[in-house]
Amino acid sequence: MSLNVPSRRLLKSAPSSANALVPALQSLSINTRSIHTTPSQQWSLFGWGKQKVEERNKVKEELKQSELARTRKPTQEEIFERVRGRLEGDSIFADTTPSSQLAAEQDKHKDWATASAEKKLAAAHAKDQTPTGISLKKDHLVRVVDPDPRSRVRWERKMVIRKLQRGTDPWSVEPKAERIARTERKLVYKTGYLPTSVKKLVHLSRQIRGKTVSEALVQMQFSKKKMAKEVKTELLRAEAKAIVTRGMGLGKAAAAAAQKETGAEPVKIQTKDGKHLEIRDPTRIYVAETFVNKGFTRGVELDYRARGRVFKMNKPTTTMTVVLKEEKTRIREHQERVAKKLRQGPWVHLPDRPVTSQRQFYSW
């Protein structure tokens, strides 16, 4: 049989000597109760996550010191020391390579580059080369200017044989086309794509046809058409190309000197359109032919109409081709027309022709 009695009741019923132990027991009970009221950070599962108080205090102290060092303003002596340390060395490579050694290496490199450039220039002047070392000899450039030399040699041999045969044959006559190509000059120039239509550009094309280049330029200068300025620019380009590449229009001074010495009158001709001209310079350039061609469509514009209909309007481009010739050609054509007219003889009202289509009855 057991007896359950509270400890406080036993202590109160104990003698005075036992009463002296009550405060100690109370403090013991308080301390034992404080075990359950400690922070949860001091406790962990199976000993994981335990930190000693000293380590935590050490970490806190380090963080506090770093924060103070970051927020503290530098003193004037520290600022001077930083600036002086930056300006002491010659360069960022002062520890590894002295400045004198770097300067010597740079001078050496400059001398080598200068000598190499002078050597290349001397070799170019001496051996017909460009400064980059490209040879300018004909043998080296044969594949550029003469891609198929064997075919060229065969064609030249064929042309020489043909010329000798025709020159030694008393019955051979030079073809008319070859004679014209040998004695007269011509240039065919095609403009770029102009932002206009064929119907609009054809009027300017007809306006300059048959006129000299100077007259055509004047017509385009005072024309109200939008494309007149473009046509004028293209005419100037065509004239410059004819002078440079074909040697056209360079006999004005020679013709004037010859007329002054001999006192010859200017040549009077009549064009196929019936216009009479006086030609003082046979090398003067004129516009022999002009024609226009349709180009690509440069854009599309929508035309909105009634009842929800939409029409597509194309924006066209057009090119114009100009054929430039010298006045020698017009003189020859005039002479050919006059000779043909003389060969035909006078017109006969009732020529003597044989009777044809005879029948047994009258056909009138």
Swiss-Prot record:
Component of the mitochondrial ribosome (mitoribosome), a dedicated translation machinery responsible for the synthesis of mitochondrial genome-encoded proteins, including at least some of the essential transmembrane subunits of the mitochondrial respiratory chain. The mitoribosomes are attached to the mitochondrial inner membrane and translation products are cotranslationally integrated into the membrane. GO terms for biological process: translation. The lineage of its organism: Eukaryota, Fungi, Dikarya, Ascomycota, Pezizomycotina. GO terms for cellular component: large ribosomal subunit; mitochondrion. The keyword GTP-binding does not apply. It comes from the Eukaryota. The keyword Ribonucleoprotein applies. InterPro entries: Ribosomal_uL22, Ribosomal_uL22_bac/org-type, Ribosomal_uL22_sf. Belongs to the universal ribosomal protein uL22 family. This is Large ribosomal subunit protein uL22m. Keywords: Mitochondrion, Ribonucleoprotein, Ribosomal protein. Component of the mitochondrial large ribosomal subunit (mt-LSU). Mature N.crassa 74S mitochondrial ribosomes consist of a small (37S) and a large (54S) subunit. The 37S small subunit contains a 16S ribosomal RNA (16S mt-rRNA) and 32 different proteins. The 54S large subunit contains a 23S rRNA (23S mt-rRNA) and 42 different proteins. uL22m forms the wall of the exit tunnel. It is found in: Mitochondrion. Pfam families: Ribosomal_L22 (PF00237). GO terms for molecular function: structural constituent of ribosome. SUPFAM superfamilies: Ribosomal protein L22 (SSF54843). The gene is mrpl22.
